[in-house]
């Protein structure tokens, strides 16, 4: 056992200083700095990847810098270094936003402006039109900052608790924070008022939703939209079928009504014909009295002649 302990102790790197320093090294790990062949061109032409704390060019502040864009120092106007009171710099100095009026050449404050008068892509103000409407008519030519809506995703509860199984594939945002070493060791005496670092929030697994990878939410939303469209199409088809059935029933009803009207008209015409025939005999009876009946009997042989008094004159008389 003693030999094993000695071996474990010797396996630690020299100058580690114990587990606490190892944890500090892991949490404060910095990526190596890479230099490419085109890095000087980017720094010289676009002032790219230059340190933000580099000194200010005094020659440019006085009005003329012979190096111009090749100068390794910062070229800032006097408005970026405004002072207030006893020489204290404004909170808006180099860490503030670029003046939106200066971008258009319309800033009236000049050197007294509390915003930056320099073209710095990292300090550009946010485009209000893009924030309100989700798009900007100026497109890529807009001078203001267009923030991707995906960057406003809610924080990942699994990552805040300490670990997210999906890693960079998670559809929620992962905010990197410096952990409190005391809390990581097991106890922080300052509690919620700790200023040494973040305290990961612990939430029970049953109270947390399952993490989803990027694109899964869009697929679920697409499936729901497809189901809604299918239901809508089915409803439209049922509505068309019901409308056709109603139209067919209405046509059949109209046909039956037409047939009924036709039968009624034929029946009325037959009744009118019968009434007309019966009405002729009645007229003869009324006009000729009782002799009409006898004449009717003798009409079969000779018929009647004339409309005189005596009635009929046939062959039998």
From Swiss-Prot:
C3H1-type zinc finger span: 51-78, 93-120, 121-149, 150-177, 179-202
Keyword Glycosyltransferase: no
GO molecular function: RNA binding; zinc ion binding
Biased composition (Basic residues): 302-317
GO biological process: mRNA processing
Cited InterPro entries: CPSF4/Yth1, Znf_CCCH, Znf_CCCH_sf
Keyword vocabulary terms for this entry: Metal-binding, mRNA processing, Nucleus, Repeat, RNA-binding, Zinc, Zinc-finger
The protein's name: mRNA 3'-end-processing protein yth-1
Source organism per UniProt: Neurospora crassa (strain ATCC 24698 / 74-OR23-1A / CBS 708.71 / DSM 1257 / FGSC 987)
Gene: yth-1
């Amino acid at each position: 056992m003693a030999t094993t302990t000695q071996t474990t102790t010797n396996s630690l790197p020299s100058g580690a200083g114990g587990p606490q320093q190892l944890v500090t090294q892991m949490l404060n790990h910095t990526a190596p700095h890479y230099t490419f062949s085109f890095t000087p061109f980017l720094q010289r032409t676009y002032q790219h990847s230059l340190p933000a704390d580099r000194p200010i060019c005094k020659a440019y502040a006085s009005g003329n810098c012979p190096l111009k864009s090749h100068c390794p120092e910062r070229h800032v106007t006097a408005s970026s270094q405004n002072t207030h009171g006893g020489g204290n710099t404004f909170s808006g100095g180099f860490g503030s936003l670029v003046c939106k009026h200066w971008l258009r050449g319309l800033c009236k404050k000049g050197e007294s402006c509390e915003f930056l008068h320099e073209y710095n892509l990292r300090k550009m103000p946010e485009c209000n039109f893009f924030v309100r409407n989700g798009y900007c008519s100026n497109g890529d030519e807009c001078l203001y900052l267009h923030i991707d809506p995906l960057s406003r995703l809610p924080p990942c509860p699994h990552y805040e608790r300490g670990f997210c199984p999906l890693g960079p594939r998670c559809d929620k945002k992962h905010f990197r924070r410096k952990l409190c070493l005391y809390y990581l060791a097991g106890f922080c005496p300052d509690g919620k008022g700790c200023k040494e670092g973040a305290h990961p929030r612990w939430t029970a697994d049953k109270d947390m939703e399952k993490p989803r990878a990027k694109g899964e939410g869009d697929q679920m939303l697409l499936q729901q939209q497809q189901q809604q469209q299918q239901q809508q199409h089915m409803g439209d088809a049922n509505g068309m079928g019901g409308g056709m059935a109603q139209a067919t029933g209405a046509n059949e009803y109209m046909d039956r009504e037409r047939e009924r009207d036709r039968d009624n008209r034929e029946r009325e015409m037959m009744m009118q014909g019968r009434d007309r025939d019966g009405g002729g005999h009645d007229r003869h009876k009324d006009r000729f009295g009782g002799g009409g009946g006898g004449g009717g009997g003798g009409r079969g042989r000779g018929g009647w002649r004339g409309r005189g008094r005596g009635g009929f004159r046939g062959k039998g008389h």
